[in-house]
């Protein structure tokens, strides 16, 4: 399945440095200038997965294929974007197309990199961006909801669901709260909220960009952001974009030593990628064989035919059953033959809800 995270933030907070490190390219021009990233830069990065390495080793696979997540480096936002100031209109259009927002916040001092607001205050920065998104949503809903209410009063069932859930979102926005706090009462309202593509309904991951010295522990600024995230149902990670950019240029064998010297167990990018994956409500299942072992992505709660469809639409259309082994059983039993002998291979039908880590073989007929 396709899923995209938009990297956003005020100018000069480290967005493009972070994106460059993510994709190990210099595709985005990381310069000390507010609008150095005018066109969105898109990069697909592998989701780090030690489980896949173990599965491939047991299956003696010739190739490993990780699942991927797409990051979009979106042009810097400034105050007034909801009215089209700066690159506001372009920013809002680009962010509307992503599934989740990765909001980079400056949590480091340093006079050599200018701040567009002339101060370092990540909470204020977060509120500046959130306010612009809320104003854009507010403008949209104040025009849409009255029309939906009229249609609902005339007996339009679809409009009734939309009017209910979007009316709730509008009330939240008027209280300066994001639309992601909206609580749809049923699946129909949930679909209506998703169709509305509200900017503040998208899940948010705050990335606290800190100095090298704070990369392992964070600092007072990143702690304040973490507290904010917890209060509003968002997530946060601490990262040093400058360090990650340096790590990205190192040979694999030198990276672990570099991380050890910094007191880090894994790169900040890996933590960020996993956090984004979880934020989108995604899980991983696997296929394994001599030719390749591969990680696949589905939404949490997906049933077996939907997972089969990620491989090929024919698999979903002609789904018969899914021969399934839990990851721990696959490793413990040394692969599919051992799991079968131990009674750990299950034959699951169309109502089976896929579990994170399942190793699956789909049987189908078209």
Q: Each predicted region: which residue ranges?
A:
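Conserved G1/Walker A P-loop phosphate-binding module
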Residues: 1-114, 123, 142-143
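C-terminal-of-GTPase-core extension/linker across diverse P-loop GTPases
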Residues: 2-8, 13, 19, 147-355, ...
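Alpha-helical initiation/capping and key positions within long helical/coiled-coil segments
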Residues: 37, 86, 90, 133, ...
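Conserved Switch II/interswitch segment of TRAFAC-class P-loop GTPases
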Residues: 43-48, 75-85, 96-158, 174-186, ...
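Short amphipathic alpha-helical segments with heptad-repeat character
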Residues: 92, 131, 135, 142, ...
């Amino acid at each position: 399945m396709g899923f995209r995270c938009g990297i956003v933030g005020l100018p000069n907070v480290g967005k493009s440095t972070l994106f460059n490190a993510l994709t190990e390219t210099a595709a985005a021009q990381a310069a000390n200038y507010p609008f150095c990233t005018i066109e969105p830069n898109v990069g697909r990065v592998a989701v780090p997965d030690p489980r896949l390495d173990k599965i491939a080793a047991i299956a003696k696979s010739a190739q490993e294929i990780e699942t991927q997540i797409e990051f979009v480096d979106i042009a810097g936002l400034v105050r007034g974007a909801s009215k089209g100031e700066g690159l506001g209109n372009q920013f809002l259009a680009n962010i509307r197309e992503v599934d989740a927002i990765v909001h980079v916040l400056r949590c480091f001092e340093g006079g050599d990199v200018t701040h567009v607001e002339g101060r370092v205050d990540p909470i204020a920065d977060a509120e500046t961006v959130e306010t612009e998104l809320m104003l854009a949503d507010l403008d949209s809903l104040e025009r849409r909801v009255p029309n939906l209410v009229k249609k609902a009063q005339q007996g339009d069932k679809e409009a009734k669901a939309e009017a209910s859930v979007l009316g709730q979102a509008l009330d939240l926005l008027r209280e300066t709260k994001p639309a992601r706090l909206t609580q749809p009462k049923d699946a129909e309202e949930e679909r209506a909220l998703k169709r509305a593509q509200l900017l503040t309904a998208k899940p948010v991951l705050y990335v606290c960009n800190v100095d090298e010295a704070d990369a392992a522990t964070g600092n007072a600024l990143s702690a304040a952001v973490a507290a904010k995230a917890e209060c509003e149902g968002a997530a946060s990670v601490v990262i040093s974009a400058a360090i990650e950019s340096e790590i990205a240029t190192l040979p694999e064998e030198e990276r672990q030593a570099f991380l050890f010297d910094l007191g880090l167990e894994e790169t900040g990018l890996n933590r960020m990628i996993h956090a984004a994956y979880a934020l989108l409500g995604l899980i991983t299942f696997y296929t394994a064989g001599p030719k390749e072992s591969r990680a696949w992505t589905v939404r949490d709660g997906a049933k077996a035919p939907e997972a089969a469809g990620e491989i090929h639409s024919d698999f979903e259309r002609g789904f018969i059953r899914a021969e399934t082994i839990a990851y721990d059983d696959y490793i413990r039993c040394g692969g599919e033959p051992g799991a079968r002998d131990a009674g750990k291979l299950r034959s699951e039908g169309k109502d089976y809800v896929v579990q994170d880590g399942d190793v699956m073989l789909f049987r189908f007929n078209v």
